């Protein structure tokens, strides 16, 4: 087992939040050291517009939050360009009537509040954060599986990531207990390929689900939760094997490398963004392979933004692309995030939400939009170098 490690960035973020919010109950407008340059009025206005838009989005999310602490949304999975609702999952109407919610959407919404500097005991949205933390903890089963309304391993991973970020920023015994159990389940569910799939203990793996689990494990380990080193190493090896090593698509990632559909797709925006992000978080920065993948993301962004602006592809893909390009830094990220921010601002609805027409629904789109717009604040550990 690895010695517990506490990520310095997570501690600094928590300390900065506490110091700032003792003097002011509202969440801080910007994190220390992240203010846009005063010499660039256009970028300064963009940042201010982004902060205002994100706050309107958070207000919409707060108004939509249910008494259980979560958000209702369609439980399903991507199939080609469509989103298929699972037969065994609770419908949105059933969730609302029975006090259940969509776990992954709720965890992402919780992360949106954290990204704005709100904690369970700090910030204007502290009550929403408290409620969603309690909701996610309540979704923990005896075996450690985090699930609600029929959600699967995607939701488990995002819920684990959310708990890790909350625990790193605010602590809490109940959060720690649920987090440790959820991490143990991920470890136990890792298959012989080194990855994960939709359901616990699936024999096959795919890169999308695997990256979610790996990022959750890394986040947990960084704030002191014990994770076997071998589990991380095997997952990283799976991601590495998913990468094209030569030829026209050098550096790009395959969605699957075994079973049906293996080696069929390696030019998908979200998959390549997720692959680079996973390796970056593991400290692997191979310029020869990463540069082609990052350049692919910049080229592919225009198509995703133009044709999939309200689609699951846009929100999920940019969640990872923003992390991958931010870790790379420099002019590539600046160019990307300026375009991304302007596109997101243009899509905000009059009531403050963002649409997600193909996917879980508008709570998902709004939460993702708020996370991406608030990235410059760097409160979330996933957006700290």
What is the meaning of each model-derived region?
Residues 126, 133-135:
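Active-site-surrounding "flap" and adjacent substrate/cofactor-binding loops of secreted or lumenal enzymes
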């Amino acid at each position: 087992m690895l010695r517990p490690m506490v990520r310095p960035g997570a501690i600094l973020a928590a300390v900065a939040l506490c110091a700032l919010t003792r003097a002011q109950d509202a969440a801080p407008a910007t994190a220390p050291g992240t203010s846009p340059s005063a010499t660039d009025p256009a970028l300064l206005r963009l940042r201010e517009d982004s902060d205002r838009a994100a706050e309107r989005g958070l207000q919409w999310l707060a108004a939509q939050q249910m008494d259980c602490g979560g958000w209702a949304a369609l439980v399903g999975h991507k199939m080609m360009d469509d989103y298929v609702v699972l037969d065994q999952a609770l419908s949105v109407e059933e969730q609302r009537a029975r006090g259940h919610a969509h776990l992954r959407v709720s965890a992402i919404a919780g992360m949106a509040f954290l990204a704005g500097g709100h904690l369970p005991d700090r910030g204007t949205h502290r009550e929403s954060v408290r409620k969603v933390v309690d909701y996610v903890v309540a979704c923990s089963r005896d075996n450690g599986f985090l699930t609600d309304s029929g959600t699967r391993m995607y939701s488990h991973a995002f819920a684990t990531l959310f708990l890790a970020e909350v625990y790193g920023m605010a602590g809490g015994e109940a959060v720690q207990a649920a987090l440790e159990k959820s991490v143990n389940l991920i470890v136990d569910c890792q298959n012989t390929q080194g990855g994960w799939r939709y359901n616990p203990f699936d024999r096959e793996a795919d890169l999308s689900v695997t990256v979610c689990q790996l990022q959750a494990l890394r986040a947990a380990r960084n704030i002191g939760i014990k994770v076997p080193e071998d589990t991380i190493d095997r997952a990283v090896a799976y991601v590495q094997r998913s990468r094209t090593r030569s030829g026209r698509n050098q550096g790009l990632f395959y969605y699957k490398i075994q079973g049906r559909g293996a080696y069929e797709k390696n030019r998908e925006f979200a998959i390549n963004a997720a692959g680079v992000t996973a390796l970056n978080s593991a400290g692997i920065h191979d310029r020869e392979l990463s540069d082609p993948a990052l350049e692919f993301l910049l080229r592919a962004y225009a198509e995703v933004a133009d044709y999939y602006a309200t689609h699951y592809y846009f929100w999920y893909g940019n969640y990872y692309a923003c992390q991958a390009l931010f870790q790379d830094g420099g002019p590539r990220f600046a160019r990307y995030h300026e375009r991304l921010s302007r596109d997101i601002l243009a899509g905000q609805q009059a009531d403050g939400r963002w649409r997600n027409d193909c996917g879980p629904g508008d709570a998902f789109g709004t939460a993702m939009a708020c996370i991406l717009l608030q990235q410059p604040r760097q409160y979330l550990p996933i957006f700290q170098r």
